Amino acid sequence: MATIVAWESRNLQLQGGGGGHGGGGGGGGGERREYMFEKVVTPSDVGKLNRLVVPKHYAEKYFPLGPAARTSPAGTVLCFEDARGGDSTWRFRYSYWSSSQSYVITKGWSRYVRDKRLAAGDTVSFCRAGARLFIDCRKRAASVSSSSLVPPALIKVQLPPSRPVVDEEEAACGRRCLRLFGVDLQLRADASPALDLQL
């Protein structure tokens, strides 16, 4: 269950312009982590565009940009620790692209994708403990490939014999029957087969 914490933007490890180290792994080992959000990455998130689009409602809630950073093409730098421990610190350029009205993580993202071997369908999750930010990923569940499926056995189906449109007995009596849209229409023997339609 997620811990609800009163939060202000100054608690984030946001650094304007990319200076400073930030996000080191020291101290606060007993801090409780608050789950923020996760995203199933798309082909464009892990492809040659080298960027992760952060869903707008999560970006504005958890990584708000001040007016100066929002209008600056440089944005800011977010520093994340690896949620699984170790000494890995991930520094990402985070900015708002007004052209597409989206929040994106750019510089540093391609390294994370490569190091974690992310593929479309994998999930990236974000959490925090106080002012420390954490990132984690998990692979999508292995799907059953069509090559691993066993072909089904051939099944023989015995269909009932089809019913002729004109019954032999009715044909012998001189009556004709026409089946139209599942309805049997009885035709008179003296009726002309041609229809005289006047429009």
Swiss-Prot record:
SMART domains: B3. One of its GO terms (molecular function) is DNA binding. Residues 15-29 have a biased composition (Gly residues). The keyword Nucleus applies. The keyword Acyltransferase does not apply. One of its GO terms (cellular component) is nucleus. PROSITE patterns: B3. Residues 37-141 bind DNA. Keywords: DNA-binding, Nucleus, Transcription, Transcription regulation. Signal peptide: none annotated. Residues 13-32 are annotated as: Disordered. Coiled coil: none annotated. It comes from the Eukaryota. This is B3 domain-containing protein Os06g0107800. It is found in: Nucleus.
